[in-house]
């Protein structure tokens, strides 16, 4: 079975995503965000777009979204997804990293097995203020309306929060769910 690639967008937690997958015995490779799309299409069964400081430093990540491979975007990864498909991203009102209670509105594939409210660790320096057409709002919080989205027919998912950090309760479940999506 092919591995899942974790695309390094220069975020401070990208290596933790890779480690979380390894800890779950999910074969994963951390790759630069300049990796050619042809290489992604032939060598990986899923793509995780990691977080990062700025969309201007996101390399060619937007090109990966047309490959037909399942994608999970985390923080900046969500913003890349939203912009690619016509959503709008703007500076967040809350800024920096911190604990947030997220309300799950829809327990779809990526959020399967979660309770209705979960404490997570998130950054809201930027956030999605309008989701793309064809996407479903999965979760929100008191400080950010768009905490998670999905387009199941494209197998594309995005989270504002960081499931890879220890402050996010049950964060590894997202990766288990994504692994299952990539195995279908």
Swiss-Prot record:
Sorted UniProt keywords: ATP-binding, Glutamine amidotransferase, GMP biosynthesis, Ligase, Nucleotide-binding, Purine biosynthesis
Superkingdom of origin organism: Archaea
Pathway where it operates: Purine metabolism; GMP biosynthesis; GMP from XMP (L-Gln route): step 1/1
Active-site residues, record numbering mapped to chain: 75, 162, 164
Keyword rRNA-binding found: no
Matching Pfam families: GATase
EC number(s) stated in the UniProt entry for this protein: 6.3.5.2
InterPro entries (alphabetical): Class_I_gatase-like, GATASE, GMP_synth_GATase, GMP_synthase_A
Annotated GO MF terms: ATP binding; GMP synthase activity
Glutamine amidotransferase type-1 domain segment(s): 3-184
GO terms under cellular component: cytosol
Cited NCBIfam families: guaA_Nterm, PRK00758.1
Primary role: Catalyzes the synthesis of GMP from XMP.
PANTHER family for this protein: GMP SYNTHASE [GLUTAMINE-HYDROLYZING], GMP SYNTHASE-RELATED
Assembly behavior: Heterodimer composed of a glutamine amidotransferase subunit (A) and a GMP-binding subunit (B).
Name this protein carries in UniProt: GMP synthase [glutamine-hydrolyzing] subunit A
């Amino acid at each position: 079975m092919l591995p899942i690639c974790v695309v390094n967008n220069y975020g401070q937690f990208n290596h933790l995503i890779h480690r979380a997958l390894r800890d779950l015995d999910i074969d994963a490779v951390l790759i630069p965000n300049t990796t050619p799309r042809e290489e992604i299409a032939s060598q990986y069964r899923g793509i995780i777009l990691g977080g990062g400081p700025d969309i201007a430093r996101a390399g060619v990540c937007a090109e990966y979204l047309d490959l037909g491979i399942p994608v999970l975007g985390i923080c900046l990864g969500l913003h890349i997804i939203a912009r690619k498909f016509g959503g709008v991203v703007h500076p967040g009102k809350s800024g920096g990293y911190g604990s947030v209670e997220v309300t799950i509105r829809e327990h779809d594939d990526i959020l399967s097995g979660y309770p209705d409210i979960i404490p997570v660790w998130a950054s809201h320096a930027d956030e999605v203020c309008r989701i793309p057409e064809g996407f479903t709002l999965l979760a929100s919080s008191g400080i950010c309306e768009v905490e998670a989205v999905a387009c199941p027919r494209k197998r594309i998912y995005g989270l504002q929060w960081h499931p890879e950090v220890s402050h996010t309760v049950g964060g590894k479940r997202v990766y288990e769910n994504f692994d299952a999506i990539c195995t279908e």
